[in-house]
C-alpha cells in the first residue's frame, strides 16, 4: 500500500516543510470511468464512516424508514459520525423510545462526547457516557429500525445478520465489486473492504441517483437530501464535513478517520 502511495499534501512551517502526507485518490464520472487518479485506484481499503450513506441505503429502500415514520433528521443521523451534542443524543433517545427500545439495545459501546458542552454536563452531573453518546449511535439506531422491520434477532452487528447482509448487498451493488473481506469497525459493526475505485463508483452512483427511477436510486436521493438539509446532524458544529456541506451547496461530504469522500454531480 505504502510503496504505491504518492505525495498528496505538504505542511510548511515558515520556510521549511514540516510534514508530508502520502496516499491514494481517485475521481470517477457518473458512468464509473476514472477521470483522474493519484497512486493506486485499485488499492483495497476500508471506507469506514465515509460510506455510512451506503449502510443507510437498506433502511430506506426496504421500506423500514417509512414504516416507522422516520424523518429526514433521522436519516441524516443514520449517516452521522456525530459530536454527541444534545441535538444528536436527544434525537437518538426519542428514536429508540419510539421503537420500544433503549440505550442498552445499541451494540455500539459508550463513548465520551466530542461536544464540549455535553462532556462538561456529564462531568458536572457525575455521569458516565452512554451508548447514545457514541458517534455512531445514529447509524446503530438505523440498524435497529431495519432489524425491527425484518423481524430479525437482536445481535444486528453479526456478519450473518440480515441487516449486515443487506448492507453488504448495498455495497456490492453501488461499487459493482465483490468485497474481498471485512473488518470490525470501532463501533462493533462490520466494515467491508473495497477498492478505492469501487467506493468512488459508489459515490458517483449516489451523485447521479436523480437521473434514475428505481427504488434504490430514489432512496439514495432521499438520503442525500436529508444530509444536505441537516448537515449539523451528520457531524456537528465546527466539524469539517458539516461546514463543507454548508459552504459547497449541493455536495455531500461524509468524513472518516482516514479520508473524506465527495459525491457530487459532474457539471455538463
Residue map of PLM features:
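Beta-lactamase-like hydrolase cores
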Residues: 1-42
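Active-site-adjacent helix/loop patches that line small-molecule binding or acyl-intermediate pockets
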Residues: 1-2, 71-179, 187
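Short, contiguous, pocket-lining structural segments
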Residues: 17, 47, 132-139, 158-163, ...
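Active-site SXXK
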Residues: 47-64
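Residue-level preference for non-acidic, small/hydrophobic
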Residues: 52-56, 199, 258
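Short, conserved active-site entrance elements at the starts or edges of catalytic domains
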Residues: 169-178, 182, 217-254
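Active-site-proximal alpha-helical segments within enzyme catalytic domains
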Residues: 190-209, 219-226, 260
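Conserved small/polar residues in nucleotide/adenosyl-binding loops
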Residues: 258-264
